[in-house]
Amino acid sequence: MPGSELSVLFKGRNFLRLLGGLGVTLELSAVSIALSIVLGLLLGVVMMLRNPVTRALSRLWLETIRIVPQLVLLFVVYFGLARAFDIQLSGEAAAVIVFTFWGAGEMGDLVRGALTSISAHQRESAAALGLSRAQAFRYVLLPQTVRRLIPQAINLATRMVKTTPLVMLIGVVEVLKVSGQIIDAARYDAPQAAVWIYGVVFVMYFLVCWPVSLLAGRLEKRWM
C-alpha cells in the first residue's frame, strides 16, 4: 500500500537523516559557490589581460572544466592526488576543491564575457572625462558588469547545487546517499519505498532550485 511505503520515510529518524543530508548538500554548495565567486572574479580579470602566459593558462583551465566530467575530476582529486601525495583528504574537502575549480572557471568566463560585452565607446567616454583606468573600471565598467553577471551567476549556482549528488560516489553522505541507505534498509518491508523517497528528494531539490531560477529569470529580464 502507498501509505505503508511512504511511512518508511517517517520511521525512526529517517526524515531527520534526510534533512541532514540536504544540509550537507547545501553546505557543500554554499562553500563552493562562495569560493567560486571570489576566484572567478579574479580569473575573469586575468582573462582580460594581454599577457599571453596568463591567457594560455586561463584558457587551459576553462577547457579542462569543459572537457573533463566533474565525476572524473572528483575521482582524480580524491583517489588520485590524495593518495599520490599521501594527503589525508575527506570526501567533503575533495568535493569543495573540485566544485570550486569548476565553478571558478565558469565564473571567470562569465566575468570575461560581461566585460567584453560593454562597448568600447564607454571606455573612451570615461577617458575623455578624465577618469583613470581604475576609476573607469570602478564607476563605469564594474556596475554594468555586475548587472549582466548576476543572473548568469545565479544560474551557475543552481547547476552546482544539482551536481552535488556526484559526491556520494566518493563517500560523502549527502541527501541522495541518505535516501539510498533508507531504501536499502526497507528493501524487504517496503520494496516500493524508493518511488516515494526519491520523490521527496525530487521535491527538496525543486524547492531549493526553483525560487533561485525564478530570481535569475526576473533579474535577466530586468537588467539584460
Segments (PLM) and residue ranges:
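Transmembrane alpha-helices and adjacent helix-loop boundaries
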Residues: 1-224
